[in-house]
């Protein structure tokens, strides 16, 4: 089966969630093969290790998908202006970013 580079989609926290003093960023990684990849979250370019949860890739239509979550407090979300989800798969790296200014 040919290799497939993942598609990466990054979702910001919802305004409803921010009202509860939480902020969850969701990085969806879809349509990749083989089913091994790593996710690195960054805040303003600095890797974040705390509050990261990544699901095990599962097979869907002969390819794999996984989701990674970055769990923050609303205050932490407001501390940085740019967040990114960097996915490394085989020799390819796909990075998606969002700036907080665009989400408010």
Curated annotation (Swiss-Prot):
Residues covered by the Ig-like domain: 6-99
Record-linked PROSITE patterns: IG_LIKE (PS50835), IG_MHC (PS00290)
Keywords: Disulfide bond, Immunoglobulin domain
GO terms assigned for molecular function: antigen binding
InterPro entries: Ig-like_dom (IPR007110), Ig-like_dom_sf (IPR036179), Ig-like_fold (IPR013783), Ig/MHC_CS (IPR003006), Ig_C1-set (IPR003597), MHC/Immunoglobulin (IPR050160)
Example of a GO biological process term: immunoglobulin mediated immune response
GO cellular component, as recorded: IgG immunoglobulin complex
Entry keyword Disulfide bond: yes
Source organism, top-level taxon: Eukaryota
Cysteine disulfide partners in this protein: 27-85
Protein name per the record: Ig lambda-1 chain C region
Organism: Rattus norvegicus (Rat)
């Amino acid at each position: 089966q040919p290799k497939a580079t993942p598609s990466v989609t990054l979702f910001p926290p919802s305004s409803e969630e921010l009202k509860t003093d939480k902020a969850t960023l969701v990085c969806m990684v879809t349509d990749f093969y083989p089913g091994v990849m790593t996710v690195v979250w960054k805040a303003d370019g600095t890797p974040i290790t705390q509050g990261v949860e990544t699901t095990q890739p599962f097979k869907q239509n002969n390819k794999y998908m996984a989701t990674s979550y970055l769990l923050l407090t609303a205050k932490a979300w407001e501390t940085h202006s740019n967040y990114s989800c960097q996915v490394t798969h085989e020799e390819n790296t796909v990075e998606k970013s969002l700036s907080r200014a665009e989400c408010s």
